[in-house]
């Protein structure tokens, strides 16, 4: 008997065909990957297999039980870890585990041995609220919650999105140990190194299975999607070196000197100093909990430093918050768009927030819709857009007012490789106009696209330089190895 068997599964949301005639099977004890571009139907497929959605047509079996007719038989047998972690932020670590155990008719005490190896890494923090955990710790807690009732099949919908490379490696070490215990694992991932850890992979696109095979065969066959050509930079067109921009590429638009942010005795940001030039793409890297987000909040005027100095676009970060906000753009991990407004309404709203006026807003809105090829979508709710399209819109809105600096906080999390490359072309275009890019990312291939990089560990900047300089200094072949080498020395969790 197969662990999973699908026969001609289809699912539509009104006119949108999320899944069309999907058929495949998964062997027991297999790590089976589901990959594909944004909007391919991956999450819909997971929800059907975990009995959260009913298919419109076809049959799906989990451990031999029908997902429609035998839901109650299936639910105790499956664990599900959605992409955004289904944790209750105001409950403690231990309270979350007890809650999920109760949902599945068991107790935390009974399930403890099945999660002991994973849970032991966060058990010292069992009384801490889930919302106060780092990304890596949330990931371990979410996995523990999905396993506390001892399921035989585990579904993971992009579980490592927004998590640093070290935590991703740790998760996959855990998954390999689960497979050794006979647990079947079905995982969706946008990371190519994770795809290669699967036994087999299904490529899903436009709601259809386009191919199923070993990872390397699938990646080669669909290389245009998963291995698009590397971005070739024309560095002469950036940092104001050409195009008649007359920009001073040596002018520092961000300057930080001995910056500290303490919460009681805990120093989230611990004496950091650096500068960023006009038109530079500066990668601000660090493991989860290293202090990146806190530092970014200081630079954008969202928080006050405990000590030290800093300026952004010529304004003091301690005393001139409002001036800074007028000269920067900001794009968060969640894109900061309003899902219940249309594309056009979102653009106009943010234009107004940035102080733009009537005719200018109308002209630039039309210009942006045309550039993004969103003219036919201008009256569509943002909630209806695929993730990659939301990403492009959010970035375009964040630089709509031509700020001197734009802060991008993990802007490509959960987006497929081809869409990420397209997004970076937008970044290069903005940098060519003299906009300074300050970006955090957990994708180390993106780190290679930056002019310079800093790597934070335990609140301090441990390394800073160009990708080539850092690889040479630490004698490593790529930025993934450099990052892992430095981040593994962290003492914070």
Predicted regions and their residues:
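Conserved ABC transporter NBD signature motif
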Residues: 58-66, 74, 308-316, 323-324
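Conserved ABC ATPase "signature" region
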Residues: 98, 102, 107-125, 348, ...
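Conserved ABC ATPase signature
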Residues: 129-133, 340, 381-388
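Catalytic Walker B motif of ABC-type/P-loop ATPase nucleotide-binding domains
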Residues: 154-157, 406-410
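ABC ATPase "signature
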Residues: 212-213, 464-465
């Amino acid at each position: 008997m197969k662990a999973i068997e699908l026969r001609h599964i289809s699912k539509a949301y009104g006119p949108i065909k999320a899944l069309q005639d999907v058929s495949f099977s998964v062997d027991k004890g297999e790590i089976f990957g589901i990959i594909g571009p944004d909007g391919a139907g991956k999450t819909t497929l997971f929800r059907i297999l975990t009995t959260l959605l009913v298919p419109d047509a076809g049959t799906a079996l989990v451990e031999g039980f029908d997902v429609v007719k035998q839901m109650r038989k299936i639910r105790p047998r499956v664990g599900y870890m959605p992409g955004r972690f289904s944790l209750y932020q105001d409950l403690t670590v231990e309270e979350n585990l007890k809650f999920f155990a109760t949902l599945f008719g068991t107790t935390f005490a009974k399930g403890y041995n099945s999660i002991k190896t994973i849970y032991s890494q966060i058990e010292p923090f069992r009384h801490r609220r889930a919302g106060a955990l780092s990304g890596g710790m949330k990931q371990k807690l979410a996995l523990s919650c999905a396993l506390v009732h001892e399921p035989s099949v585990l579904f993971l919908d992009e579980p490592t999105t927004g998590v640093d490379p070290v935590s991703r490696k740790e998760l996959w070490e855990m998954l390999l140990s689960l497979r050794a215990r006979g647990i079947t694992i079905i995982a969706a991932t946008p990371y190519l190194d994770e795809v290669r850890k699967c036994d087999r992979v299904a490529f899903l696109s436009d709601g259809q299975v386009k191919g199923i095979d070993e990872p390397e065969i699938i990646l080669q066959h669909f290389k245009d999607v998963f291995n698009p050509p590397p971005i070739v930079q024309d560095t002469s067109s950036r940092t104001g070196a050409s195009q008649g921009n007359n920009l001073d590429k040596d002018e520092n638009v961000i300057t930080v000197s001995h910056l500290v942010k303490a919460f009681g005795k805990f120093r989230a940001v611990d004496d950091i100093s650096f500068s960023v030039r006009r038109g530079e793409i500066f990668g601000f890297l660090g493991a989860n909990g290293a202090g990146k987000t806190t530092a970014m909040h200081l630079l954008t005027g969202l928080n006050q430093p405990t000590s030290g100095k800093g300026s952004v676009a010529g304004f003091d970060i301690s005393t001139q918050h409002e001036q800074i906000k007028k000269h920067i753009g900001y794009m968060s991990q969640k894109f900061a768009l309003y899902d219940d407004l249309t594309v056009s309404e979102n653009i106009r709203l943010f234009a107004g927030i940035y102080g733009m006026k009537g005719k200018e807003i109308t002209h630039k809105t039309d210009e942006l819709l045309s550039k993004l090829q969103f003219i036919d979508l201008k009256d569509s709710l943002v909630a209806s857009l695929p993730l990659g399209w939301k990403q492009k819109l959010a970035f375009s809105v964040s630089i709509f007012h031509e700020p001197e600096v734009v802060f991008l906080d993990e802007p490509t999390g959960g987006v497929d490789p081809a869409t990420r490359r397209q997004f970076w072309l937008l970044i290069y275009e903005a940098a060519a106009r003299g906009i300074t890019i300050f970006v955090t990312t957990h994708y180390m291939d993106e780190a290679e696209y930056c002019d310079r990089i800093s790597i934070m560990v335990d609140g301090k900047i441990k390394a800073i330089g160009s990708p080539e300089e850092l690889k040479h200094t630490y004698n490593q072949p790529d930025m993934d190895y450099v990052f892992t080498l430095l981040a593994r020395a962290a003492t914070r969790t």
